[in-house]
Every structure is written in C-alpha cells, then in structure tokens.
Amino acid sequence: MQEIIPDFLEECEFVDTSLAGDDLFAILESLEGAGEISPTAASTPKDGTTSSKELVKDQDYENSSPKRKKQRLETRKEEDEEEEDGDGEAEEDNKQDGQQKMSHVTVERNRRKQMNEHLTVLRSLMPCFYVKRGDQASIIGGVVEYISELQQVLQSLEAKKQRKTYAEVLSPRVVPSPRPSPPVLSPRKPPLSPRINHHQIHHHLLLPPISPRTPQPTSPYRAIPPQLPLIPQPPLRSYSSLASCSSLGDPPPYSPASSSSSPSVSSNHESSVINELVANSKSALADVEVKFSGANVLLKTVSHKIPGQVMKIIAALEDLALEILQVNINTVDETMLNSFTIKIGIECQLSAEELAQQIQQTFC
C-alpha cells in the first residue's frame, strides 16, 4: 500500500516531493487547512519568498519611477502655483476688505462731524432756555418745542391777517386824501375855552393886544388911546365878542396873569404829551415799556424766562385789535427780552399807559 500511493502521486501533476514521506493523515489535514488560509497568506509563501507578480510590479515601479517623479514634481509645482495664486487673491481680498473698512470709518466720521455742526447751529438759532442739556436728544427736543411755538405764532398772525382782509372787504374804508395826515396818538378831549370874568374883560380893554397883526377897524381888540375917556360897554356884549374871537382862533389879549400862568400850562401840557408818548410799567415779574414812534408803537418787555409768555402777549395784542409788524425774542443768561413793533390805527382808543398796564397783566 505504501508503495502504490507514491507511484500514484508521482504521476499526478501537482506532486510535491517534500511530502513523500509524510503520512496520509497529515496530507489530508494540510488540505483541510488550506481553505482557511487568507488570500494574502496564500499569495506569500511560508518561507518568505516573494511571488512572481510582486517582482514584476516592483520592476515596473523601478522602471517608471523617474516619470512619476517628474509628474509629481510638475503636480507639486502646479499646486504651489495654485497656492501662491490663492495667497495673492487672499491678500488682494484682504486689502480690499481693509480699504472698504477704512472708507466706512471715514464716511461715518464725516457724518458724525456734520451732525455735530448741524446741532451746534440749531442750538445757536433758538433761545438757550429751550435746551437744558447739551446732548443730542435735548437739543432736538428743544428745537421741536421752539418750532411748534413759532408755528402757533404764525397761525395766530395768519388768522389775524385773514380777519383784517375780511373786515376790509365787508366794510371798505374811504380812501384818504393824498395829503399825509398827522398821526393820531390817542384820543383826547378838545381843550376848553378859557373863562373870562368881567374884571379881566375890563383889564383887557385897557391894554393893547400882543398879536403882531395890525388892529383892524372891526377888531374887538382895538387899542383905545389913554387920553380919551373910556366908553362903558355892556359886559354881556363884550363877553360875547371875546368868546366869538376866541372861538375863531384869534390870540388872547396880553395880561400879566395869563403870562405868568402860561409856562406852567405849557409844562403841564408837555408832560402830558410825554406821558402819552412813553409809558413804563414795572413790577416784580417784568418791566414793560411802551413808546409811540410815528404810526407805530414799540413795546419792550424784560422778565425772567417764562415759557409761553410770547404767546400770551400776542394774544393780548390781538384782543386789543392791534397789528403786529415784527417780533424779536432775545435771551441773556436767565433774562428774556421781547420787543414788538405794532401798527396802530385810527380806531385805537388806548393810551401808552393803558397799553403798558394791559401787557403787564399778562405776566400775572
């Protein structure tokens, strides 16, 4: 049996002489374990020798390595160039970003500078008591309040102008003569004619008149020569003639009493005219000054800062049917100075003192 098996194995193509002396069971065990061997283990023999396929691959790699090196070098150069291009583009992008940031910063800086300049101008245009602090919110709030008050003043003036237009349309006035008439400051009572007693009449008849005119034959002030005897005349007739002459505007006869009293009368008349032209009203709250200047009236008020006081004064002037031509509002520290230019008409029935008292009541 042992001799037959080796003969059979020798005839086989896959005979292995190294296994000639082994037992059959060892051969079977080796065949059964061959299925469990991994492909990598099967490709590499146990003795560590390399297969023919691996040798061919190594030879191909050794033969083609310079080309691959060139390709690798070329690919590396291309990659380096791409990286450099990418770095250049990144640098350009960074530069552009930096320029954009700088431009944004400069634009924002210029905008803030212009805003500060505009706020400074706004603060200088309005009275200082409208702004309590110097921040932007306080300045803008004060501007809004000041503009709203000016709008109210404008609306009141427009309403007054419309009322005046309607009044002129409904009741047209007579066109005055081209000759300028003297301005009427305030209505006054006509001066009373002086009363003359009988003693003054007799005294006037004795003295010549002081008028520069030459006595006429029909003049009641005819001079009588002192050497001639006086002709007594009825006192009633002399009184009527003198009264008629005084009503016609002839100058009164000279008398010491009248000459002595004339300076006092003229001084009283001048003082009354001055009082009517200028009037002052002072109180703890405000000082009011009224001054007539031609056809206009200048009204000045000096007081502490009182919000809304200008509107009160304008309303009071409108109630008195006075036309406001100009309004000036000035402030110095905590003091407020208001000046009004007012046009008066013929229908005005107020004197300067009464107007000053009316304006003084608005401060109460």
UniProtKB/Swiss-Prot annotation:
Result of changing residue 65 to A: Extra divisions outside the stomatal cell lineage and reduced phosphorylation by ASK7
A single GO cellular-component term on record: nucleus
Alphabetic keyword roster: Activator, Developmental protein, DNA-binding, Nucleus, Phosphoprotein, Transcription, Transcription regulation
Effect recorded for residue 214 to A: Ectopic stomata formation and increased accumulation. Ectopic asymmetric cell divisions, but fails to produce stomata, and reduced repression by osmotic stress (e.g. mannitol)
Regulation: Negatively regulated through phosphorylation by the MAPK module. Activity is constrained by polarized BASL in stomatal lineage ground cells (SLGCs) undergoing ACD.
Expression across tissues: Expressed in developing leaf epidermis. Reduced accumulation in the stomatal lineage ground cells (SLGCs) where BASL is polarized in the cell cortex. Observed in small cells of non-protruding hypocotyl cell files and of developing cotyledon epidermis. Restricted to meristemoids (stomatal precursor cell) in leaves epidermis, mostly in dividing cells of non-protruding cell files.
Chain positions covered by the region annotation Helix-loop-helix motif: 113-150
Region of interest (Basic motif), residue spans: 99-112
Biased composition range(s): Basic residues: 196-205
Consequence recorded when altering residue 38 to A: Extra divisions outside the stomatal cell lineage and reduced phosphorylation by ASK7
Post-translational modification: Phosphorylated by ASK7/BIN2 and ASK3/SK12; this post-translational modification inhibits activity and limit epidermal cell proliferation. Phosphorylation by MPK3 and MPK6 leads to the inhibition of stomatal fate and to degradation. Stabilized by CDKA-1-mediated phosphorylation at Ser-186 which promotes stomatal development.
Disruption outcome: Stomatal defects in cotyledons and hypocotyls.
Subcellular localization: Nucleus
Positions carrying Phosphoserine: 38, 43, 65, 171, 177, 181, 186, 193, 211, 219
Region Disordered, annotated ranges: 35-109, 171-227
Chief place of localization: nucleus
Composition bias, Polar residues: 40-53
Record's compositionally biased regions (Pro residues): 175-193, 209-218
Nucleus found in the keyword field: yes
PANTHER family: TRANSCRIPTION FACTOR FAMA, TRANSCRIPTION FACTOR SPEECHLESS
Self-association and partners: Homodimer. Forms dimers with SCRM and SCRM2. May interact with CDKA-1.
Protein name: Transcription factor SPEECHLESS
Organism: Arabidopsis thaliana
